[in-house]
Amino acid sequence: MIKKIYPFFLFISLISYSQNSVLFTDNFSGIESVLFNPANIIDSYYKVDVNIISSTSNLGNSYSVVKPYDILKDIEFGINDFNTLNNITNSNGNLGALKDASGLKSVDSYVLRNDYSSHSNFYGNSTVLGPSFLWSINKYNAVGFTTAIRFNGNVSNLNTDLYNQFLEKTYLDTPELLLKNDFGTLTGSGQSFSWYEVGFSYAAVPLHNSSELLKVGVSLKFLRGIKSYSFLLNNLTSNFTLNIDDLENSSLDLNGSISVASSYEGANYGQGIDIGFVYEKRNKTLPINSRDKKGNIYFNKAPYSYKVSASVTDLGFLFFNNVKQQTNNVNVNLQNSNFNISNYLGVGFQDTKKQTYLLPTTAHLNVDFNINNHWFINTNIDYYLFSDTRKYAMKTVSNFSITPRYESQHISAFLPVSINKFGILKSGVGLRTGFLFVGSSSIISNFFDESKEFDFFVGVKIPIYNSKVIKEYKRSIRKYTLDNGRGNLNKKRRH
């Protein structure tokens, strides 16, 4: 059974990955950073920042150790393949159609080994950001506009240990394990979603003085659903019967039900909101007082000692108007591994209903330390706010990362190290220039270690810098350097 379910969600994940916040925590990230905290767009170095197209992508699992570079090599999906997405979303779980659309081979050709468990998980999410921009109206107000196509997919708590014992016939080596019949109730669920998204963002500065800056922001998002697909194993119990005379003819009885649901064309819509704030602690000797055209005093752009950001993203819902659902009772005997899951998935839908799903609501906490002018250390936590067992909620994976970086106007470099809730550790590298950013937070670990997770981020943009703000910042840096120089000189004289 799992041998049929697992490939579907792996192939879905191969072309629908997850957001990665590593590259969007620096001070030159521009409009892309609005995905994780809408307050980031204010107090920017940009007058206008235009995203042409970008993608943040990640897939992973707690089950298979895979060869990610072989997957990338085989994927037939380029910037001109506009029909590929349509083919995938219309495949309705058909493995042949998915393979044809993606250009991928069989799952086994990408797997090095499997780590079996009674609670295996697979996950993948993605945001493809289309034409988007931010506009810094003045020192205190900024607005943003985003367009995106997003994907979300996961399979949770599948008993791959039982899969290994029976379908791979490893019970031939240790049949006494199966004689205990201690499998309990087999549970598991999976879901995948895709949708269009348009967002409007606003950010402001309610507090600013010589040593503190507070930024707040909000994004309102309007969604249009493309496709949803899900399955649920309902109280599926198992009983193994060992044939002592002929071990290969041992059998497994399954009893319970499998529910499958798939959306079709209809008025699929949704709404979402992101909220966030950013607090900067600045060296009060650095900002230089200025006056705007109305005579109001403000503090010029200056380095901070540390910055604390907090936000909640994807607080909302996605409504599908035409969801066809079928629940199949399962009462079968699996002998000689002759069992076709397609008999229970995707045939004879019996019920049509409306269904609302909660978006993958996530809390983000970010602390950024300024070590010395261009050098920073960033710590970030992404925490999924719903229970993994919540039935009608999209899911994402909680993650913790530490990222040292070098940052300047025209180039930034990142060395992220992160670990997620499943204990998967990864490290990578990223690079940002004025018009291009590219990287992967797992590329280093994938080169030197076996991989259960792979990601990349890439994008093209048009930055239009605010020359006045850049000059203010550089002037503050020079003042900081001079003050440090005088301080060091005075220390030497005292000694």
Q: Where on the chain are the PLM-derived regions?
A:
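Subset of outer-membrane beta-barrel
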Residues: 19-495
